[in-house]
């Protein structure tokens, strides 16, 4: 059964650091982290070394804030 992960981090190396919080549905924590590296790297044209993960936490379906993820659940 997939779990829901909230990932907090920042992108360094640009003009000013960008802070982000994303929620993903994944089987393992590693899969969610891989997904964030892939998505942010492609959208913001940054390398994985510039993406710093601050916190990864597993959350319940009630705690989801992303409206798209809420619609899927």
Curated annotation (Swiss-Prot):
GO molecular function terms attached to this record = large ribosomal subunit rRNA binding; structural constituent of ribosome
Which Gene Ontology cellular component terms are annotated?
Answer: ribonucleoprotein complex; ribosome
Which top-level group of life is the source organism from?
Archaea
The protein's UniProt keywords, in alphabetical order, are: Ribonucleoprotein, Ribosomal protein, RNA-binding, rRNA-binding
Read off the Pfam families from this record.
Answer: Ribosomal_L18A
Biological process (GO) annotations held by this record are: translation
Q: How does it assemble?
A: Part of the 50S ribosomal subunit. Binds 23S rRNA.
Family membership noted in the UniProt record: Belongs to the eukaryotic ribosomal protein eL20 family.
Q: What is this protein called?
A: Large ribosomal subunit protein eL20
């Amino acid at each position: 059964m997939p779990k829901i992960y909230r990932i907090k981090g920042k992108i360094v190396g640009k003009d000013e650091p960008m802070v982000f919080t994303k929620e993903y549905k994944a089987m393992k924590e590693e899969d969610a982290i891989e997904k964030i590296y892939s998505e942010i790297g492609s959208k913001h044209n940054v390398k994985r070394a510039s993406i710093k993960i601050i916190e990864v936490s597993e959350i319940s379906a009630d705690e989801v804030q992303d409206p798209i993820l809420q619609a899927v659940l």
